[in-house]
Structure formats: C-alpha cells, structure tokens
C-alpha cells in the first residue's frame, strides 16, 4: 500500500483476522504497532486476538454466507486467515471481487487440508515426501495401511494442534487410529491421510517470508512433539550448510508455488543427507513463538511487514533460544495464573506470554515461556523450568 491510514478514520487501513487464537493475537499486536485497524473474528467470544483488536465478531467461518456478509460489511483491505477451518471457496470468490486474501485464496485452499498441499508438493513440484495414501472410508483406510505398512502415521486431512493424529505400529491399533482421526478432524468425520513413518533424525520448521524485497529465511527451528502437538521449540537447530541449502530450496519452491506475500511455516523432516517435505502453513507457526525472544523481528512482525508490502531486509537472530508451552488440563471459565514472580526470577531474562484464553475444557495450551541461554540445551531446560513454575488455578 502507498499509505497506511489511522484507525477509525475515513482513511483507515483495515485488516480482518479469521481466527483469533494466540497466534492471531500476536499478529493483531503487530498490526496495531503500525496503526492498522484490526477486526478479529472467531467462532467463540473473547478469543485472545479479540482482546487486543479494535472490534470483533463471532461467526462460524465455515459458513460461507455469514463470512461473505461480514467481509462486505467491514470491507477490510486485508483478509488474514489464521486457522484452517474456513470456507475457502468463499475466500476465492471474495478475492475475485477484489479483496486481498493473505497470502492468496489459492494458498489458503491448498493448505486448509493435507491433501491439497501434499499433492502440490509431491505430484506437482516433485519434492521428496513420505509415501502416502488418502482414504475416504474405513475400508479404503485399511487398504492404505496395508499398502504403507507399519509403522505409519494417521492424520485427518483437516485438523490442527495435533488433533486426531496418531502413529500406528501394529494391527490392533488400526481401528482405534481411524476413530481417533474421525473425532479429531476440524470439520467432523472425513478423509484421512495415511503416511509412511519417516525415521527422521530431527524435524524443523523453516519460517520463510515472501515479501516485496524477495524471499527470506529465518534460522531453522527445532521442536519436540508430543501427542501431535509441540511442547518445546528452539532456534537455531544445528544442521550442515548442505542440509540447510536443501531445506531452503524445498521451502522456496513451495512458497513460490503458493504465491502472495506473508510468512509461511514450512515443516521438514531431516534424515541423513535428505530433506523431506511434511507440511506448510501460510501463516505464523506455533513452533515459531520462540522468535518472540530469538530474533529482532518475530515471525508475527515479519508476517505483518510482508502483508503490508514493507521490505524485510536483514533478519537478526540473537543466538540460542527456546520456548516451552504452559500446558494444563482441567475445566473452567475462570483461569488464574500465580507464582509468576518466582517463575520469572529463577531464570534471568526469561519472558512469559499468557494467551488469555477464556476457558479450558480438557488439555489446552495457555501460555509459553521464552528463554535465551548459552546453548540450546540449556535454553530448553530453563524454558521448561519457567513454564512448569506457573501456578494455574481453575
């Protein structure tokens, strides 16, 4: 854009967030820093990003008619999807009408489910991936498992935060994994992907920025997953120059194919001298929350700069850093956090982000601890120490 306006004025620059969780909250804050009028949307009230937006709306974003009516009402200059469960056909129609969908409506459609992006990467771009089959019915699923063999990974084609994902290692786990995948899909029961298990040495998130001044890469981020969801992430992940170059090549090809401006979280498996494409999100990635302390520009700041057509320039990484999630289990609409002075005082320079989620029902990520240290291993342990010390009361 040639100019950025002032909120609530006739010339305001308006951005609509579709999805208002903790990642959307940080995007909203970065938009606010540049004077953008922020409209936060989600399926429930008082979502984290709504708490820092100029105004908010509660709708089902899978309801294409409701979504279209809201966009026509607000007339945002930028529509910024922050989750997968959105009526992507509606976004494509809105883009055709002249609305700016970030990064593109095509990218949102292809990445809203694992089938679109896997077919793009493996079949169109010919990038290395694990072997895979898609299944619509339980019979197709069982046949796919037989063809892939054990161990294999089962995922709903549309889910987030590890929901519905499992590793099947023997025959008596097959039926259970199917049911778990059906329960964990974002849109309810539906297709699954059956993947061959890659016995990787490690996995990384390569945050890749497509901006007016070209494609930029953050230092690779390592992470540990448990039950399909990340628990700790760290930057930089140590890897050879050759592997980093291969990783950047894969990420560049995927991002170029998806098009548009913004930050992309490209997930890759590293095995020996090989790099395998796993998934990509056309938006900030949960493992990238470590960049809130590890870089001069966080993934959220980079996303916003790219969206607004601002140059990225040089990304400065400060050295070994880690994040550890504050994960708790319970049921409450009155969540309180204690022992914060002690939690932070034990590690000089430690930081904490509490997401402000309005309720917990079961297991939920409520915050993240952030630490810089002399080495990655120490940063991970210290971040876990801070996260564990937070006293969450329901």
From Swiss-Prot:
ATP binds at residues 114, 155, 160-165, 195-198, 203. GO terms for molecular function: ATP binding; magnesium ion binding; phosphoribosylglycinamide formyltransferase 2 activity; phosphoribosylglycinamide formyltransferase activity. Pathway: Purine metabolism; IMP biosynthesis via de novo pathway; N(2)-formyl-N(1)-(5-phospho-D-ribosyl)glycinamide from N(1)-(5-phospho-D-ribosyl)glycinamide (formate route): step 1/1. Pfam families: ATP-grasp, PurT_C, RS_preATP-grasp-like. Its EC number is 6.3.1.21. Keywords: ATP-binding, Ligase, Magnesium, Metal-binding, Nucleotide-binding, Purine biosynthesis. One of its GO terms (biological process) is 'de novo' IMP biosynthetic process. Mg(2+) binds at residues 267, 279. Residues 119-308 form the ATP-grasp domain. GO terms for cellular component: cytosol. Coiled coil: none annotated. It catalyses: N(1)-(5-phospho-beta-D-ribosyl)glycinamide + formate + ATP = N(2)-formyl-N(1)-(5-phospho-beta-D-ribosyl)glycinamide + ADP + phosphate + H(+). N(1)-(5-phospho-beta-D-ribosyl)glycinamide binds at residues 22-23, 82, 286, 357, 364-365. Belongs to the PurK/PurT family. Involved in the de novo purine biosynthesis. Catalyzes the transfer of formate to 5-phospho-ribosyl-glycinamide (GAR), producing 5-phospho-ribosyl-N-formylglycinamide (FGAR). Formate is provided by PurU via hydrolysis of 10-formyl-tetrahydrofolate. Homodimer. This is Formate-dependent phosphoribosylglycinamide formyltransferase.
